[in-house]
Amino acid sequence: MSSSGTSITCEVGLQLIVPDRAPVPLVARLDYSVDDPYAIRAAFHVGDDEPVEWIFARELLTVGIIRETGEGDVRIWPSQDGKERMVNIALSSPFGQARFHAQVAPLSEFLHRTYELVPAGQESDYIDIDAEIAEHLS
């Protein structure tokens, strides 16, 4: 895990769940920045292909570690693998679907660091609404 005063990056090992086959191990890079304090960017690396990138709410991952949450494109829910706490992440788009299985511990550590950077409920303090509106109107 690496961090600066304005961002945090973490690589997490996941398993891609493939029907009728053994899970495929892969790495996802998670990025969080005060420039977009509500979002987590995830880049899923499969083999030598370009990473597949998704953006979803930090709160979605936070809640999904504890209980099932999300609808539509991103769903996250906890599970147990023996004594190991796990989390499932299901992604859906017009181009396909994917389901991943990951250990909770590294995701929790990543989230903890994001909340140290931008505490819950203070995300709007990091957004310049006037600048955002001006950018969209120009």
Swiss-Prot record:
GO terms for cellular component: cell septum. It comes from the Bacteria. Pfam families: SsgA (PF04686). Keywords: Cell cycle, Cell division, Septation, Sporulation. One of its GO terms (biological process) is division septum assembly. The keyword Cell cycle applies. Involved in sporulation-specific cell division. Required for early stages of sporulation. Important in the process of growth cessation prior to sporulation-specific cell division. Recruits cell division protein FtsZ to the future septum sites and tethers the contractile ring structure (Z ring) to the cytoplasmic membrane during sporulation. Stimulates polymerization and filament length of FtsZ in vitro. Monomer. Interacts with SsgA. Interacts with FtsZ (via N-terminus). This is Sporulation-specific cell division protein SsgB. It comes from Thermobifida fusca (strain YX).
